[in-house]
Amino acid sequence: KNGADLINDVSGFEYDPNTLLRLKKYNISKVLHHMQGTPNTMQKNPKYKNVLLDIYDFFELKIKKKLKNKKIILDPGIGFGKTLKHNLTLISKISLFHSLGFPILVGTSRKRFIGQISGGHDSKDRTGGTLASVLYLLSQGVQIFRVHNVNEIKQGILVFKKILLNQ
C-alpha cells in the first residue's frame, strides 16, 4: 500500500502473529530472520545444540508452517543471539541454507564479531572486516547483503568479480 517491496521482521514473525495475516494480501518478499531470544536477552549466553542445524531447522519449520508464499529471503541473523564461534560457523557453512531453495541475506556490516577478531572497537572502523566477510559470503553464493558502507563494499565486490573472471 505504501510502496514497500520487502518486509524484514527480526523476530522471525513471532512478536506479532497478525503480521503474516496482514501481509497475505500484498505480493512482497518477506525476510525470515533468525534471532535467539529478544533484543534485550539475545546476547545473554546464547546456546545451541548445533547452531547450523538449529537455524536450518528453524527456517524449515517456519517455511512449512507459516510462510507458504514463495517470496521468502532467509537471514541467519549474524550477531542476533550468537557468539563469535556461532557467527563464524554460520558464515563458513552458509551454503547449507541454499538447499532450502530461497535467496540468502546476510548482514555482517560493522558487527561485533569483526571487532572481536580484529580488535576494532569502534564499529565505524570495521569496513575492512565487513568487506572480507561479504566477499567470502559472495563466494558461497549469498545473494543479498545488508551493509553500511555501500560504495566501499560495491567497489570491493566489483574488483573481486573482475579478478575472478580475469577479464
Where are the regions a protein language model picked out?
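Flavin-dependent oxidoreductase catalytic cores
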Residues: 1-2
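Short loop/turn motifs enriched for small/polar and acidic residues
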Residues: 77-79
